[in-house]
Amino acid sequence: MKLTCVLIVIMLFLTVCPLITADHSRDKQEHPAMRLKDRIRYLRRGKLTRDCKHQNDSCAEEGEECCSDLRCMTSGAGAICVT
């Protein structure tokens, strides 16, 4: 009887544990993993580059660069990428 109760408690714990510890970011991965083979292929094609900011996008934070034909212009409200 005691063994049965212990087994039931363990089974309940094991079924509830993943629900308690689960992260609520389901299907919201920001940077999906890229296989090494794909990464090498993109590097050879020159497509593995940092994203640049387009016209009228904010460029105030460090590390954010405007695309090659744009420049970051600071105004009273912040900074945006302009031609």
Swiss-Prot record:
Organism whose genome encodes this protein: Conus miles
Alphabetized GO MF terms: ion channel inhibitor activity; toxin activity
Pfam families found in the cross-reference section: Conotoxin
Keyword hit for Nucleus: no
Recorded domain comment: The presence of a 'disulfide through disulfide knot' structurally defines this protein as a knottin. The cysteine framework is VI/VII (C-C-CC-C-C).
Disulphide bridges, residue numbers: C52-C67, C59-C72, C66-C81
InterPro entries for the chain: Conotoxin (IPR004214)
Signal peptide limits: 1-22
Name of the protein: Conotoxin MiEr92
